[in-house]
Swiss-Prot record:
GO MF annotations in UniProt: proton-transporting ATP synthase activity, rotational mechanism; proton-transporting ATPase activity, rotational mechanism
Protein name (record): ATP synthase subunit b
InterPro entries: ATP_synth_B-like_membr_sf, ATP_synth_b/b'su_bac/chlpt, ATP_synth_F0_bsu_bac, ATP_synthase_B_chain
Species per Swiss-Prot/TrEMBL record: Hahella chejuensis (strain KCTC 2396)
Subcellular localization, as worded in the UniProt entry: Cell inner membrane
Lineage, highest ranks first: Bacteria, Pseudomonadati, Pseudomonadota, Gammaproteobacteria, Oceanospirillales
Primary location class: membrane
Family in the record: Belongs to the ATPase B chain family.
Signal peptide: none
Record's subunit section: F-type ATPases have 2 components, F(1) - the catalytic core - and F(0) - the membrane proton channel. F(1) has five subunits: alpha(3), beta(3), gamma(1), delta(1), epsilon(1). F(0) has three main subunits: a(1), b(2) and c(10-14). The alpha and beta chains form an alternating ring which encloses part of the gamma chain. F(1) is attached to F(0) by a central stalk formed by the gamma and epsilon chains, while a peripheral stalk is formed by the delta and b chains.
Transmembrane segments: 5-25
Amino acid sequence: MNINLTMIGQAIAFFIFVVFCMKYVWPPVIQALREREKKIADGLQAAEHAQKDLELAQEKVAKQLREAKQQAAEIIEQANKRANQMLEEAKDQARTEGERLITAAKAEIDQEKNRAKESLRAEVAALALAGAEKILETSVDAGAHSNMLDKLAAEL
């Protein structure tokens, strides 16, 4: 009988132990497992969200980089156009200035040529007058013979 009574006592003790565990031990363990499961699920969800955010950020960075490269290319193109335009303007200004200088030089040359002609005419007239005086051995009055001198100057 002792064996049966011992077994019954052990069964009752085991039953009390199981009830105690189910009432006081098992709920905190289950709650801890559920909390851990929730933390893991939240962590996975946060990781997925972070991965999506990372992909969006990478796409945004790539887009901004493309836009920046495009803007840089446009700025370089505009700078090249402006440089070419400035070069053409400088060429035009140099050409205009050269033409102006050539025109001024030609005008100055013409003036010098006319002055030289006038000077030569005056010298030739004086020489002709001196030659005529020597030929006639008389003094030729410039006032009296101005028509003759004008004709002579015009012919020269």
